[in-house]
Amino acid sequence: MINYNGNLTENTNISLEQNRGFLYGDAVFETLKVVDGKILFAEDHYFRLMASMRIVRMEIPMYFTMEYMEEQVKNLANALNISASCRVRLTFFRKSGGFYLPITNDSEFIITAETLQEPLYSFTENSTYEVDLFKDFYVTKQLLSTIKSTNKMVQITGSIFAHENGLDNCLLINDEKNVIEALQGNIFMLKDKKLVTPPVTDGCLNGIMRKQVLAIARKTEGLEVSEESISPFELQKADEIFITNVIKGIQPITKYRKKEYGNTLANELIKKLNVLIRLG
């Protein structure tokens, strides 16, 4: 079951042959984590979605307020009998018609949901998580790279590369050969009490969890926080590297090429993140 424009319906009732999201990737989306019926960081997700729609010149329905978004997500979760935690995808796509040039900028939306086992964030303390660079394709330094659109070929081919090479993830680089993010999350690097993450202007996703971690880190005593470009060479001198996204929270990287990393700061930040959620 899905939520299609505010109506709960079966997936089989949706036609794809004229759907612009399917035909041209003419769609933007948000991945949400819901805990006990509440969207985590709902306001941040809502305003990023609205900004993304404006960037691609997609009309925002007048009725689609943040309260409406929360209500529609809750309606679907209830219909699917999901009571604890779930992963939700909210996708907006331009209405059918036209080729590359649409005949309208009006939009529609679909919401899907699936159960998550863990409501709070965690990672397995002694597990390995190995990454390497994905160099077949680059992410360009432009505004479109910072939004969650359905054009994800770099991430798809990178995921296949990671799978074929026994890696847990890959790090993406931009056209200036700087590391900007992982396949499905932002990246942070710790070196000598300085925490660095690439700026959005480098082409990384304007991540919701990135924003939360930056805010928590800036309140952490003795920790310098900076948004600056990261070269692949700098990664090999780091003390810790971790990935952030709204579903996983924080995922420490344990190995990049021959270098192995700790997770002390990642562990501290994830505890503070869970406190933030409980206080929510």
Predicted feature residues:
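Ordered, amphipathic secondary-structure segments that act as subunit-interaction surfaces
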Residues: 79-93, 99
